[in-house]
């Protein structure tokens, strides 16, 4: 399959691994204090474990996991607010499949469905808009979440809802922005992050220039990388070369997909519908300044929270779970005392075990047998 098989070719992978090992000998880092590369995106984390790339690294390079999985950082209180709305008479509540099993204090949306709420899985926000048009006597709510990657689709759907005059369609906003989170991580004095592999999907929208502050203000090298083995390994080589040269630059490994300027049409749609401002709570990380997303005045009438006014929910994370430490690269999933026991894919305690892109789910799927051994 073109653009897939050639990026997974075993011979080329091993050649690149050997090149990485040779270059890593020039690093000042050791096995006791390796070069810590944070892969920000959950898709990167999944690919790293699926293909065993972390096991091919030289001993003085380590991948650490970041907060780039939007389902994984869903606060419990937001899930409870969704359940409140979904449980009301006459409501059809729509969201993506990953969000169905995220636990809140009052259970999950899947459990709310089992109790009688009309909760439905959709594959795009346009599916929810079609439901609203097909059911004019019902109030249809779309629970939209994700980083800049998914915001354009939501924005264009709301534009369509406005143009068509769909009065029974509402939007529960859990979109968040990635860059303030990276800044928040780097502002923590004990962050231990030496370099970044930045997500290709978000970068398709925002471009590469948006990451400039990481290199200029925090002096960390960053490479935007794709999701195949050769992409990730080449990204690691590029970060090693910058570290050897004592450079801190933003580079683009994923040029076949990501233009440096991003997607101007997607950026325009986001700017019309959303205000990228305000604080937002992230599960396991607390409140992060300037990471929130809100509807602009022209689209306020679609605001589900303003219409339904669910009771404010603020639920503290269970201190036994180490979700926040996993999301900031401070520990590995299997080092959490709940991993694989209280928290597993069949009965998830934390959101990182729910999403297919969650670090804990990836560890459980690809590393559990090694841990048991």
Q: What positions do the PLM features span?
A:
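Phosphate/pyrophosphate-binding betaalpha-module
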Residues: 143, 147-210
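Hydrophobic alpha-helical scaffolding
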Residues: 6, 72, 143, 147, ...
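A conserved active-site cap/scaffold subdomain adjacent to cofactor or substrate pockets
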Residues: 172, 190-259
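Internal helical hairpin/lid segments
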Residues: 234-325
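Structural motif
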Residues: 92, 139-141, 195
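Metallocofactor- and cofactor-centric catalytic cores in central/energy metabolism, strongly enriched
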Residues: 1-137, 151, 155, 159-164, ...
């Amino acid at each position: 399959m073109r653009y897939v098989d050639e990026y997974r070719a075993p011979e080329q992978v091993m050649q690149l691994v050997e090149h990485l090992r040779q270059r890593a000998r020039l690093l000042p880092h050791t096995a006791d204090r390796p070069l810590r590369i944070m892969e920000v995106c959950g898709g990167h984390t999944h690919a790293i474990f699926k293909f065993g790339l972390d096991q091919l690294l030289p001993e003085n390079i380590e991948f650490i996991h970041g907060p780039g999985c939007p389902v994984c950082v869903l606060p419990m209180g937001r899930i409870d607010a969704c359940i409140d709305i979904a449980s009301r008479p006459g409501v059809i509540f729509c969201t993506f499949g990953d969000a169905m099993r995220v636990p809140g204090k009052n259970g999950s949306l899947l459990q709310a469905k089992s109790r009688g709420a009309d909760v439905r899985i959709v594959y795009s926000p346009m599916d929810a808009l079609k439901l609203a048009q097909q059911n004019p006597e019902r109030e249809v709510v779309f629970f939209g979440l994700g980083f800049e990657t998914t915001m354009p689709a939501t924005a264009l759907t709301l534009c369509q809802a406005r143009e068509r005059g769909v009065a029974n369609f509402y939007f529960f906003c859990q979109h968040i922005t990635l860059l303030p989170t990276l800044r928040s991580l780097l502002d923590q004095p004990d962050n231990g992050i030496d370099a970044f592999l930045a997500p290709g999907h978000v970068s398709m929208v925002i471009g590469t220039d948006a990451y400039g502050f990481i290199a200029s203000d925090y002096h960390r090298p960053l490479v935007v990388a794709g999701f195949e083995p050769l992409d990730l390994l080449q990204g690691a080589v590029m970060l090693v070369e910058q570290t050897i040269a004592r450079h801190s630059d933003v580079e683009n490994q994923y040029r076949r997909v990501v233009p440096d300027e991003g997607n101007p049409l997607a950026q325009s749609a986001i700017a019309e519908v959303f205000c990228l401002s305000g604080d937002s709570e992230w599960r396991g990380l607390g409140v992060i300044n300037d990471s929130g997303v809100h509807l602009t005045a022209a689209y306020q009438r679609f605001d589900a929270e303003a219409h339904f006014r669910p009771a404010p929910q603020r639920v503290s994370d269970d201190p036994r779970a180490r979700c926040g430490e996993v999301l900031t690269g401070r520990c590995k999933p299997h080092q959490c005392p709940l991993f694989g026991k209280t928290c597993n894919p069949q009965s998830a305690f934390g959101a990182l075990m729910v999403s297919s892109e969650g670090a804990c789910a990836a560890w459980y799927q690809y590393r559990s047998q090694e841990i048991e051994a």
